[in-house]
């Protein structure tokens, strides 16, 4: 690649990169609804597919409005992700997650999650703060 009369190859592009990120962007399991599928059924299916954790092993927190993340994509289309708060019934390790879609899967505290989310993603950070506040306020374990 030639840019500003300077030649770049893959090595020089990597060496001269000034990105602050060592890993791909961190996020929540999500996906598109199938035909006639409700938001909640889609969320449970995607969670199970991407994490390998059986949906019977989580409990959606009732009486809690789902969290929504709305943004404009690089294609200038508006997108909305809907997230449901849930808790694990039995703790499990991640052993069979969908490696074709997920490069890394791990448990994080809310503070670790906030650090893992990039600074420009303010809505996602706020979702983490809101969930932590609700779980603390109502002593959800």
Model features per residue range: what roles?
Residues 1-26, 31-129, 133-134, 139-140:
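Unchanged
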